[in-house]
Amino acid sequence: MRPVIVAPVPGVTSRSRLCDKTARVTSGGHEVYRSAACSTGLLLGLLVASAHADTPARQPARLVPFDLEAHRGGRALRPENTLPSFANALSMGVDTLELDMGVTRDGVVVVSHERGLNPDLARGPDGRYISAGIPYVRLTLAEVKKYDVGQIRPRSDYAARFPDQLAIPGTRIPTLAEVFDLVRRSGDTHVRLNIETKIDPTHPDESLDPRAFVTRVLDLLRREHFTHRVMIESFDWRTLLLVQKQAPEIPTVYLTQQQQPEENIYLDKASPWTAGFDPVKYGGSVPRAVKAAGGRIWSPLYDDVTAGSIAEAHRLGLPVIVWTVNDPKDMSRLIDMGVDGIISDRPDLLRTVAAGKGIPLPGPAPVSP
């Protein structure tokens, strides 16, 4: 899905432009070529992916071409949400760069998963890891740039989770504009960005309010001429409603997690995250709640989905992009279930699994950070 734009009227298949960029991939011992542009065209309704003659097994029907997303740039391989991680993902070949956004005290959009500096990642000028997080809304960009985020804190739980991550000391937190510059330098005119607003309604003091946050992001996207290359995701649905009103051309991706302790949605009661669109109002159905809110894509925790919920989302015209899947067995199972895309810390493994399923892969766009 690079990424997809799904029209409200199902049943019509169209692509907005000809296939003008090919990439060579290997599937079942055969070479398969695909146009990267084919997966970036505007999709007006239901697009059913057909199997290639050399495909090892018939693929399930999807609403859109499969979307291979590098979570935080592929944090199992390079420092997360940094120019090195995004450059590595582009050089490897992905459909979408997934990343997160915060806004500094002086109004600059920066790329970071937390709402502030992460003690497991950020080292000050003295070389020591910070002891507590500091929200970006309390720091200027100049202050943020003083911190080194190129190496996980040794012997931390985070380091144990990603033992293969290549440390790159001296790496700084990038601005979103710097990521756009990297994408331009790569020459990849088809890769898209799935950008998340990091706002927590239960901690309103740790970020801008939703309206101010969205305004900053949309102003930057328009100034950089990137509105056509992004989709905006969030667990805080208030921000997505604002995006839909102010920039309806940008697809909104509704993130959900039902599992404790970090759930943002409940099937039987209201949640501060869902802006009043609680599943309890829609027969306990998360896809119906997303559709009612105006969502274009549903992005659930992969453990939360079933074949039934995927089918229900597809009937509603909602592609399903699951997160965060790092085990090849889970990747294979979810692809067979018919998900429309996978967000992964291991885009390299996801490429291998997808190729084995006969899914055409995006071509590489080598670039240095």
Question: What feature does the model see in each segment?
Answer:
Residues 39-47:
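Bacterial N-terminal signal peptides
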Residues 9, 46-47, 315:
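N-terminal secretion targeting segments of exported proteins
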Residues 1-33:
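N-terminal secretory signal peptides that target proteins for export/translocation
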